[in-house]
Structure formats: structure tokens, C-alpha cells
Curated annotation (Swiss-Prot):
Disulfide bonds join 28-67. This is Serine/threonine-protein phosphatase 7. CDD domains: MPP_PP7. The gene is PP7. Its cofactor is Mn(2+). Gene3D superfamilies: 3.60.21.10. Mn(2+) 2 binds at residues 113, 145, 197, 303. Residues 391-413 are annotated as: Disordered. Its EC number is 3.1.3.16. It catalyses: O-phospho-L-seryl-[protein] + H2O = L-seryl-[protein] + phosphate; O-phospho-L-threonyl-[protein] + H2O = L-threonyl-[protein] + phosphate. The lineage of its organism: Eukaryota, Viridiplantae, Streptophyta, Embryophyta, Tracheophyta. It comes from the Eukaryota. It is found in: Nucleus, Nucleoplasm.
Length: 413
């Protein structure tokens, strides 16, 4: 790594990013991770440049639908699907180099969880935003459960941003939260592959108005029994309100929480995800029903690393960065996890030493997954954790719901 410091990043005249600008940003972040204390990041990426990048990306993301249909693939030879990254910047940079950077014949779909746990969540997210701005129809960024106020306050991202940007940290953090709200929830690739961070979702409960007068009108939601829950539809997914800081676990807007937090199970049917306190568990029959109804071949989700899978019965481990969880008549359900040697700050003997992985879907039908596992980049720069990794809840279990912000108020700048 060069010891000569790079020049500070400036926003290009006219605001149009170039390939060289994005590569310069990546090089700048990699250099700073080795050579500067975190609090010096603004010397390379001034707040005004951060603001311009996030504002430009925010406008693009908020125009995308809840489920983006990626169909303009005539010139694309492959689509790369990436799982959780969790602030492991150097592994992301390796993955991009190993696979090939986004270009007109190579499309990327990132399945969420860009931040938290790892030490470079901000840099990771900004690298991905810069690629999105440069190539909006070749890079798709979906939301993960960690792109939320609750998770980022518990698993390190908020503290990371405040450490790096000091008295401007609250401003930077709020801008990131606003951008998180704009991230789409899911994608459908070439009409054959559905991707989302957590996975499937239930049909929402419709409110029942139970009063006579307008002044005293109340809305009552009757929560269904697990046996009466129905698998949701893509139309219902499109109509969900995604612009919330923390997806609700109750009420009529359950789809965002389901899509971000749910997990597969080997038990048939839908049931509450009691271990997480939000979202669903769905069985192989639900996978088959969803694939068959929409003539899909694959569901690709993320959300579970080696720590989560250690506790799951009947499902494969995450040693190689991926598992095939359901193999049904119409196709497959796959979990992909792209953060190797996870989690970063655990003592060596307590880390899982897992590989990360990504999936390549090749033309013409993009439905035959090729799995590519990779080792963590070593050595990593020295860094301090931004969360209490020894005592914090594992794998997002047993959530403190009182700490979640489930309204749809935009964060102030």
C-alpha cells in the first residue's frame, strides 16, 4: 500500500461521476483504512462531497419501486448477486476485482446488510452508492435489516459515523438513514429469480374501522392466527410502505419487516419468527407456491451468517458462504453470505473462519446459479470495534422492540 496520501476527493463539475472517480474513491478508502485514524476520514472525503453523493444516490433510489424488475439485460452476459457485507470493506473490494467491476455487460444485485459489525460500514456503503450513481441500471442496492435505525444504533454503524465525522457525525448519520429508507426491498432478475434480504412475506392484515362517528373513529387490527396467515403477493409487495426507519413488527405494514427479517424453515407453512421477534418462518411448500405462481426458478436471500445457522435445525451451515435450503419441484431457495471470517472483532478462536460467497447468473436465462466462495483478505488493518461485540445480542435475536422507530418520519438533516 502506498504511503503517499491521496488528494481529497472533490465532487466533479456538473455532478456526473466517472469510472475514474469511483475507482479513486475506493483507493482513497483503502489507503485511509491502513494509514489514518478513523477521525481523519473527513480530510479525504469532506462532508460536502458526502452530501452530494448521498443526495444524488437518494434521488435515484427513491424513484425505484419496492421490487425492482431487472429486465434490460440484452447486453448483459452475467448478473452477480452478493449477500451480507457488514462493513468488511477489503473483502468487498476483493470481490469486485475478482468478479469484475460493474459494466455494461455485468450487472450487480446487492442483497443488503452493508453496515454494522465491521469497522468500515460507512466506506462500504459509500462505495456501493458511488457505483449506483455511476451505473444505475447495472447496480441494484436492496435494503437489509441492518439498514435501519434500530440495528445501526446497536451494532456499531451509528458510533462509527460519529467517530469518523465528529461534530458533523449526526448530520452524516441522518443522511445515511434517509438513504436507507429509499433502498428497494426486492428484485426480480429476468423474470426468473427473486432476491431479497430475508425472503418471503405474508399477505397484510387489512384494518377494520369499528366506530360510528368521525371524531372517535378508531382503527383496530385483528392479528391472524398463524394457521390463517397467507403468503403475500408481488402486488402487495409493490404497495407496501418502505419509507420507515425501522420496519414495523405489528400493524398493517408488515411486509417490509417480513422481507428484511424472515428466515426459511423445514417446517411447512408460515409461522411467526419468534427467535427474532419480527418476520416469519416459511417452509418448502411456501417456496414452491411462490416459485410456481410467478414462474420463477430461484429465490436468493441472505440475512443468515454462520452464527445464525449454528442455531438452526435442519438447515445447512454457512462455512462456504452459501446453502441450498429448499430444493422443490419448481426450483431452489438459496442463502448467500458474502462476509468471510465473520464476525470481524471476535477473538480468533471464536470466529467462524467461514468463507464468503457470491453467485453468478449467466445469460440467457440467468437461472442456473454458479457459486464462488472466497477467503477473507488478510491481514486486515487494525481497527477498534464500534459495538460491544462480547455482550451484544447474537444474530439480531430477541429484539428490543421499544427501541425501534416504526413511524415514517424522514430523519432531519
Amino acid at each position: 500500500m502506498e504511503t503517499v496520501p491521496p488528494s481529497p476527493i472533490t465532487w466533479p463539475d456538473g455532478g456526473a461521476l466517472t469510472n475514474d472517480w469511483v475507482h479513486g474513491l475506493m483507493s482513497c478508502f483503502e489507503w485511509s483504512s491502513w494509514n489514518l485514524p478513523p477521525s481523519q476520514l473527513p480530510s479525504l472525503l469532506p462532508v460536502n462531497v458526502f452530501d452530494s453523493l448521498v443526495l444524488t444516490a437518494h434521488k435515484i433510489l427513491h424513484k425505484e419501486r419496492n421490487c425492482v424488475h431487472i429486465d434490460d439485460l440484452d447486453s448483459v452476459s452475467n448478473v452477480v448477486v452478493v449477500g451480507d457485507i457488514h462493513g468488511q470493506l477489503h473483502d468487498l473490494l476483493f470481490l469486485l476485482k475478482d468478479t469484475g467491476f460493474p459494466c455494461q455487460n455485468r450487472c450487480y444485485v446487492f442483497n443488503g446488510d452493508y453496515v454494522d459489525r465491521g469497522a468500515w460500514g460507512l466506506e462500504t456503503f459509500l462505495v456501493l452508492l458511488s457505483w449506483k450513481v455511476l451505473m444505475p441500471d447495472r447496480v441494484y442496492l436492496l435494503r437489509g435489516n441492518h439498514e435501519s435505525k434500530y440495528c445501526t444504533s446497536m451494532y456499531g454503524f451509528e458510533k462509527e459515523v460519529l467517530t469518523k465525522y465528529g461534530d458533523k457525525g449526526k448530520h452524516v448519520y441522518r443522511k445515511c438513514l434517509g438513504c436507507f429508507e429509499g433502498l428497494p426491498l426486492a428484485s426480480i432478475i429476468s423474470g426468473r429469480v427473486y432476491t431479497a434480504h430475508g425472503g418471503l412475506f405474508r399477505s397484510p392484515v387489512l384494518p377494520k374501522r369499528t366506530t360510528r362517528g368521525k371524531k372517535n373513529r378508531r382503527v383496530v387490527l385483528l392479528e391472524p392466527e398463524p394457521s390463517s396467515m397467507k403468503l403475500g403477493t408481488l402486488d402487495e409487495l409493490m404497495q407496501a410502505r418502505r419509507s420507515v426507519l425501522d420496519p414495523p413488527w405489528e400493524g398493517s405494514n408488515l411486509i417490509p419487516g417480513d422481507v428484511l427479517w424472515s428466515d426459511p424453515s423445514m417446517t411447512p407453512g408460515l409461522s411467526p419468527n419468534e427467535q427474532r421477534g419480527i418476520g416469519l418462518l416459511w417452509g418448502p411448500d411456501c417456496t414452491e407456491d411462490f416459485l410456481k405462481k410467478y414462474e420463477l426458478k430461484l429465490i436468493i436471500r441472505s440475512h443468515e451468517g454462520p452464527d445464525a445457522r449454528e442455531k438452526r435445525t435442519g438447515l445447512g451451515g454457512m462455512d462456504n458462504g452459501y446453502t441450498i435450503d429448499h430444493n422443490v419441484e419448481s426450483g431452489k431457495l438459496i442463502t448467500i453470505f458474502s462476509a468471510p471470517d465473520y464476525p470481524q472483532f471476535q477473538a480468533t478462536e471464536e470466529r467462524y473462519k467461514n468463507k464468503g460467497a457470491y453467485i453468478i447468473l449467466q445469460a440467457p436465462d440467468f437461472s442456473d446459479p454458479q457459486f464462488h466462495s472466497f477467503e477473507a483478505v488478510k491481514p486486515r488493518p487494525k481497527a477498534h470495534p464500534y459495538y460491544d461485540f462480547e455482550n451484544v445480542i447474537d444474530s439480531d435475536d430477541e429484539m428490543d422492540k421499544s427501541a425501534m422507530d416504526t413511524n415514517n418520519e424522514q430523519p432531519n438533516s
